UniProtKB/Swiss-Prot annotation:
Keyword annotations from UniProtKB, A to Z: Amino-acid biosynthesis, Arginine biosynthesis, ATP-binding, Cytoplasm, Kinase, Lysine biosynthesis, Nucleotide-binding, Transferase
Organism: Pyrobaculum calidifontis (strain DSM 21063 / JCM 11548 / VA1)
GO molecular-function term, one example from the UniProt record: ATP binding
Highest taxon listed in the record's lineage: Archaea
Free-text function comment from the UniProt entry: Involved in both the arginine and lysine biosynthetic pathways. Phosphorylates the LysW-bound precursors glutamate (for arginine biosynthesis), respectively alpha-aminoadipate (for lysine biosynthesis).
Catalytic reaction annotation: [amino-group carrier protein]-C-terminal-N-(1,4-dicarboxybutan-1-yl)-L-glutamine + ATP = [amino-group carrier protein]-C-terminal-N-(1-carboxy-5-phosphooxy-5-oxopentan-1-yl)-L-glutamine + ADP; [amino-group carrier protein]-C-terminal-gamma-(L-glutamyl)-L-glutamate + ATP = [amino-group carrier protein]-C-terminal-gamma-(5-phospho-L-glutamyl)-L-glutamate + ADP
Pfam families: AA_kinase (PF00696)
InterPro entries assigned to the protein according to its UniProt record, in alphabetical order: AceGlu_kinase-like_sf (IPR036393), AcgluKinase_fam (IPR004662), Asp/Glu/Uridylate_kinase (IPR001048), Glu/AcGlu_kinase (IPR001057), LysZ (IPR037529)
SUPFAM superfamilies for this protein: Carbamate kinase-like
Name of the protein this chain belongs to: Putative [LysW]-aminoadipate/[LysW]-glutamate kinase
EC number(s) on file: 2.7.2.17, 2.7.2.19
GO cellular component: cytoplasm
Keyword ATP-binding on entry: yes
Length: 261
């Protein structure tokens, strides 16, 4: 199995290259998608300012109250069905799911989270409707047919929860024993000193994620890639806007994180 994570930065810029390349892998892939850019756009149209939390270590996450959750579910559902329809037009009968469908992805609501405020002080705040994944029904996701999964989970209490798309992709890959996980973003990989870092061990990825050299969403990607690599998954962070992006990633493009460097 190959897990392909399509980031929101790709979805909101140009998804065509990914959609054109995916049919080649329809019999062996699971697709997980993001879409934070559309969530932000819809929130602003509704007069709601998107809110984000900075955690110790510099990782940033979306604060999801009930109103934000409603918009999040709406945006992810739209992206999910558009992606399924685009694949259908190319001869792929994909099935679009959220993690809540059939309890495919179960999560525990984070009631409290530790954050760093604008003054650099650590404090505990309400966790909102954000979940930590506790179980994934990988049998339900096994291809064929190709499953397209949105990052919405369900709690034991029946609550819909926002789960991080990268975290979901890593969990699916690790729990399913996938050989490879391709993370498609709008950058060529981890870039340091103006150059793409071609290969990292899990230890190197984790060390860089905790350093000041790496910022933004790449911190979370490297931390989760390190954990997935320790569990036997080769992770590739590559450019989803490139020609044949999945082919390119599996052929050596981007940054590869693996125990077998």
């Amino acid at each position: 199995m190959i897990v392909v994570k399509v980031g929101g930065s790709v979805i909101c810029k140009d998804l065509s290259k990914v959609v054109e390349n995916l049919p080649k892998y329809a019999g062996e892939a699971v697709v997980v998608h993001g879409g934070g850019c559309l969530v932000n756009e819809l929130l602003k149209r509704m007069g709601i300012e998107p809110k984000f939390l900075t955690h110790p270590g510099g990782v940033v996450s979306r604060y999801t109250d009930l109103e934000t959750l409603k918009v999040f579910v709406m945006a992810m559902s739209w992206i999910n069905k558009q992606l399924v329809a685009s694949l259908f037009a190319r001869g792929v009968e994909a099935v679009g799911l959220t993690g809540a469908d059939g309890g495919v992805v179960r999560a525990r609501r984070k009631e409290k989270v530790l954050v760093v405020d604008e003054r650099g002080r650590q404090r505990v705040v309400d966790g909102g409707y954000v979940g930590k994944i506790v179980d994934v029904n990988v049998k339900a996701l096994a291809p064929p047919p190709l499953k397209v999964l949105a990052p919405i989970a369900v709690s034991e209490k029946g609550e819909l929860l926002n789960v991080d798309g990268d975290q979901l992709a890593f969990e699916v890959a690790a729990r399913a024993g996938a050989g490879r996980l391709v993370i498609l973003s709008d950058v060529d990989g981890l870039i340091l000193g103006g150059r793409v870092v071609p290969r990292l061990t899990p230890e190197e990825a984790e060390e860089l994620a905790k350093s000041e050299e790496v910022r933004g969403g790449m911190k979370r990607k490297l931390l989760m890639a390190a954990e997935a690599a320790r569990r036997g998954v080769e992770v590739v962070i590559s450019n989803g806007l490139a020609d044949s992006p999945i082919d390119a990633a599996l052929g050596g493009a981007g940054t590869h994180i693996s125990r077998n460097i």
